[in-house]
């Protein structure tokens, strides 16, 4: 057996084991579907059922395989179950001060006309309103490293039964994350998090949950007076400074930013909060509201709070990876259940590639070999997860046996893996 054949066999075995872990509550036909979809999405780097079907190498016409996949994706919604399992697995990797980025996103469908419950969404990348489905996403990351941990991804529609609002979907996701992570992790949210219902969730108990939220326009209480956050930010002196390396149009540039923090409260709550102000990113100051403890006389403590928010930008790269690497916005199924299922399956694929394969020394060696395959074909990419996806694609796509020959995992196969660093 050649070295690449051994890598492929090992990769298939790990994929089969991972599939069994996240589908343990389903019946046998659904377990088979989930394993085939996880394999096919990675082997084709695509979510179109025709391309997934080709990678399965079945001894029947492709249209038969495609029809079977379509039928099985449509008859049961397993979004909540797989999100639960991925969140459970990911929570064990989260440390006390990791950042958990909460993001209401979108799955844009520019040219779709007949997809079920197709609604209107705001396209964040193109800054326009168009057809598509809203997304709820959560990813965890560490400030000191490039490691990202996908936790949650759900596509939904306001036209579907049982969906009340974006707020209800966000709260559903946040509740699940709290259920598995407890008080560990700091929730970081962009401007979309500046809403009363989220402050109620984070500050509704005696001990506040830790968060960093970018403000838009809100009144705060400072020194007993009610003041607008924009006015307060403009008037606040920013004596501390740091130099950041930013990338604009492919070029590395230095940017000096100035920052400070001041204690504040929200008008309806008694909890002590801090308003962090950063000047230099744009014309207007960046305003961050946090419940994390900030030592105002230590610039490192203030900047740490800013770093919690800036780490969210690494999570944005992970979102782009999930969308672009597997062509999620090119999904071509009509039923609402199928769209939701494919969305959560792409989350599972990204977790497998970016987290599961690196959780033990033996698997880390497999990742290194996959990375070498990726470099040989593509060069070194800027984001490690792209390299792993490319490497897996190059190993699985030309394979002629697909999932045939992989033994069915039993419960004894799911041994505990301890990460010793």
State where each predicted segment sits.
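Active-site-proximal, Lys/Arg-enriched surface segment
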Residues: 38, 66-145, 263
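Short acidic/histidine-centered micro-motifs embedded in hydrophobic/aromatic stretches
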Residues: 55, 72, 324-325
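Short, basic interhelical loop/turn and adjoining N-cap
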Residues: 55-68
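Short amphipathic alpha-helical segments
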Residues: 35, 49-50, 66-67
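Single, function-defining residue in the core of a domain
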Residues: 1-39, 43-46, 85, 98, ...
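Short, charged amphipathic recognition helices of the HTH superfamily
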Residues: 44-54
């Amino acid at each position: 057996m050649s070295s690449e054949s051994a890598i492929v066999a090992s990769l298939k075995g790990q994929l089969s084991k991972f599939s069994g872990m996240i589908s343990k509550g389903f019946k046998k036909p659904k377990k088979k579907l989930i394993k085939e979809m996880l394999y096919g999405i990675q082997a084709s780097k695509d979510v179109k059922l025709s391309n997934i079907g080709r990678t399965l190498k079945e001894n029947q016409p492709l249209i038969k395989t495609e029809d079977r996949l379509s039928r099985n994706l449509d008859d049961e919604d397993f979004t909540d179950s797989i999100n639960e399992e991925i969140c459970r697995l990911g929570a064990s990797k989260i440390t006390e001060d990791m950042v958990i980025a909460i993001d209401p996103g979108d799955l844009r469908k520019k040219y779709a006309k007949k997809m079920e419950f197709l609604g209107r969404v705001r396209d964040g990348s193109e800054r326009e309103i168009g057809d598509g489905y809203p997304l709820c996403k959560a990813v965890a990351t560490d400030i000191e490293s490039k490691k990202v941990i996908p936790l949650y991804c759900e596509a939904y529609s306001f036209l579907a039964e049982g969906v009340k609002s974006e707020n209800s979907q966000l709260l559903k996701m946040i509740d699940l994350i709290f259920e598995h992570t407890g008080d560990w992790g700091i929730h970081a949210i962009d401007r979309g998090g500046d809403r009363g219902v989220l402050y109620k969730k984070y500050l509704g108990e005696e001990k506040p949950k830790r968060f960093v939220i970018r403000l838009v326009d809100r009144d705060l209480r400072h020194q007993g007076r009610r003041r607008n956050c924009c006015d307060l930010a403009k008037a606040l002196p920013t004596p501390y400074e740091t130099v950041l390396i930013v990338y604009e149009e492919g070029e590395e540039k230095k940017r000096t930013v100035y920052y400070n923090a001041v204690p504040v409260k929200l008008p309806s709550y008694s909890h002590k909060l801090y308003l962090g102000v950063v000047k230099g990113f744009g014309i207007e100051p960046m305003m961050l509201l946090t419940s994390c403890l900030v030592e105002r006389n230590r610039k490192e403590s203030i900047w740490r709070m800013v770093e919690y928010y800036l780490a969210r930008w690494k999570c944005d790269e992970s979102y782009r990876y999930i969308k672009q690497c597997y062509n999620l916005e090119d999904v071509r199924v009509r039923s609402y259940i199928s769209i939701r299922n494919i969305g959560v399956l792409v989350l599972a694929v990204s977790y497998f590639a970016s987290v599961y394969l690196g959780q033990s020394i033996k698997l880390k060696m497999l990742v290194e070999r996959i990375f070498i395959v990726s470099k040989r074909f593509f060069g070194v990419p800027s984001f490690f997860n792209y390299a792993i996806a490319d490497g897996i694609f190059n190993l699985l796509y030309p394979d002629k046996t697909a999932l045939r020959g992989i033994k069915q995992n039993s419960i004894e196969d799911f041994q505990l893996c301890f990460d010793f660093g």
